[in-house]
A protein has these predicted regions:
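Short coil/turn linking the two alpha-helices of tandem helical-hairpin repeats
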Residues: 12, 17-26, 60, 65-74, ...
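Short coil turns that delineate tetratricopeptide repeat
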Residues: 2-3, 50, 93, 132, ...
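Mid-chain, structured segments of secreted extracytoplasmic proteins
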Residues: 6-56
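Alpha-helical adaptor scaffolds
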Residues: 59-65, 78, 86-87, 92-129, ...
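Terminal, low-structured helical/coil segments at or just beyond the last alpha-helical repeat
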Residues: 118, 136, 140-143, 147-181
Length: 181
């Protein structure tokens, strides 16, 4: 349904989930191709309803996921990731998911291109302020803390993620990467 924003959005969400599976399996080719396959659908959803914070968020998320699957894609998709998620936040400043998506984008975008782990951490914390039950925000906060060698904080965040979503394999894998106390 090319003229249904909702149908385009649902396709984009499916592509984003597949890209996340690729990330969890450490299959960058799958992560990149899945994310890239969803971008046109997300762009179409935004074109059909530019005032939807969620449609803008998923577009930014997919652009960020494409970057995570292929670092060179930052040149092509970096601006899309930042602008789309910024637009989502502008449309809905209380969206925990929008701040989470922005944080993931910053996590993968090199500091030289306007991203970085420190900026990501701020967004993950904001996402948790808006939704303290966000297992995904705790997961990403833990990943970011581990990246900066803040292992006690990383462990705490990942344990919180697993409390909220005990079946999340990626959170378990991330927790296993942290040296014991």
């Amino acid at each position: 349904e090319p003229n249904s924003a909702d149908a385009q959005y649902r396709f984009a969400i499916a592509a984003s989930y597949l890209a996340e599976v690729g990330q969890e399996l450490h299959d960058k080719t799958l992560a990149f191709s899945a994310a890239e396959s969803g971008i046109p659908a997300a762009e179409r959803a935004v074109a059909l309803n530019a005032n939807s914070a969620e449609y803008n968020r998923i577009l930014g998320t997919l652009c960020g996921q494409a970057i995570s699957g292929n670092g060179l894609a930052a040149l092509k998709y970096g601006k899309c990731a930042l602008n789309s998620v910024n637009r989502a936040i502008e449309l809905d400043p209380k969206s925990s998911d929008a701040f989470l998506s922005q944080g993931v984008g910053y996590f993968y975008l090199p500091s030289a291109l306007g991203g970085g782990v420190d900026m990501a951490v701020k967004d993950f914390q904001k996402a948790l302020e808006l939704n303290p039950k966000s297992a995904e925000a705790y997961l990403w906060l833990g990943i970011a803390m581990r990246r900066t060698n803040r292992n006690p904080e990383a462990r705490k965040a990942l344990e919180s993620a697993l409390e909220l979503n005990p079946n999340r394999l990626w959170a378990k894998q991330q927790l296993d990467k942290i040296p014991p106390k």
